[in-house]
Amino acid sequence: MAEQHGAPEQAAAGKSHGDLGGSYKVILYELENFQGKRCELSAECPSLTDSLLEKVGSIQVESGPWLAFESRAFRGEQFVLEKGDYPRWDAWSNSRDSDSLLSLRPLNIDSPHHKLHLFENPAFSGRKMEIVDDDVPSLWAHGFQDRVASVRAINGTWVGYEFPGYRGRQYVFERGEYRHWNEWDASQPQLQSVRRIRDQKWHKRGRFPSS
């Protein structure tokens, strides 16, 4: 369900990753198609290339989800990794801009329920769109523009995309407040689609099928 409102409303929670519960396991391979040297992780890794792998060519997520990054220390372009197989770099990079993956961490899914507020301007001002327990492949289709300058993730964990159809750079919103687009590491206030990240603890669907 997606609804629009004209004025901002009081925030629910402060920005916090909280404690990670449950089981996390990912297998990384140096070459494509799950070949070459491999390593298994069950916790965050700020630098894969320091001692584990020279590069990442393919990935198998056995339990998760995970958030991977283009650069060390959880920086750069973000890649959401849900349960499933990723035989090549372009299976996890919707933007197709970079084949680099140098750090990753488990994603905290704190609730089976999802609620997100999108705002046109920074500091939760301007036009507002509310999304509850739904995926939205096009904000335009719901009468909302592509400019999103601040976000409140009230329940659940979400991923937003630059373009419709879940394409382009990915931006993850864990429960909390994002007063300005630079707080989700975007260079401009552009989001055109958003969806829920769903843990198999509550949802058995597994990996989201990208278009």
UniProtKB/Swiss-Prot annotation:
Domain Beta/gamma crystallin 'Greek key', chain residue ranges per copy: 24-63, 64-108, 114-155, 156-198
Modification type N-acetylalanine: residues: A2
Region entry N-terminal arm, spans: 2-23
Keyword Repeat found: yes
Modification sites for N-acetylmethionine: M1
Alphabetical list of SUPFAM superfamilies matching this protein: gamma-Crystallin-like
Keyword Acetylation: yes
Assembly description: Homo/heterodimer, or complexes of higher-order. The structure of beta-crystallin oligomers seems to be stabilized through interactions between the N-terminal arms.
Disease connection: Cataract 22, multiple types: An opacification of the crystalline lens of the eye that frequently results in visual impairment or blindness. Opacities vary in morphology, are often confined to a portion of the lens, and may be static or progressive. In general, the more posteriorly located and dense an opacity, the greater the impact on visual function. CTRCT22 includes nuclear cataract among others. Nuclear cataracts affect the central nucleus of the eye, and are often not highly visually significant.
Protein name: Beta-crystallin B3
Gene name in the database record: CRYBB3
